[in-house]
From Swiss-Prot:
This is Histone H4. GO terms for cellular component: nucleosome; nucleus. Residues 1-29 are annotated as: Disordered. SUPFAM superfamilies: Histone-fold. InterPro entries: CENP-T/H4_C, Histone-fold, Histone_H4, Histone_H4_CS. Residues 14-23 have a biased composition (Basic residues).
Length: 103
């Protein structure tokens, strides 16, 4: 077998798309103290107990959008590694310019 990727008779294949895995329990990894710390950084003094589930959903939606755009930039550049610049450009595209990471 010759060097390179793929086995016998694989030939050239287009870019692989990553499957979108959805793990329901992973969103619970954002703990109440973590949400509380984020709120404190934003200047919140008291937090209602109903906020935690809503903030998890908002954070999940925000991160899905940013990651989707960053992966799109990565795939367009024919790379397999998402760089910090991909994330910076994804945030800039959504109107949330992030300074300090180049670009």
């Amino acid at each position: 077998m010759a060097g390179g990727k793929g086995g016998k008779g694989m030939g050239k294949v287009g870019a692989k798309r990553h499957s979108r895995k959805s793990n329901k329990a992973s969103i619970e990894g954002i703990t109440k103290p973590a949400i509380r710390r984020l709120a404190r950084r934003g200047g919140v003094k008291r937090i209602s107990s109903f906020i935690y589930d809503d903030s998890r959903q908002v954070l999940k939606s925000f991160l899905e959008n940013v990651v989707r755009d960053a992966v799109t930039y990565t795939e367009h550049a024919r790379r397999k590694t998402v760089t910090a610049m991909d994330v910076v450009y994804a945030l800039k595209r959504q109107g949330r310019t992030l300074y300090g990471f180049g670009g």
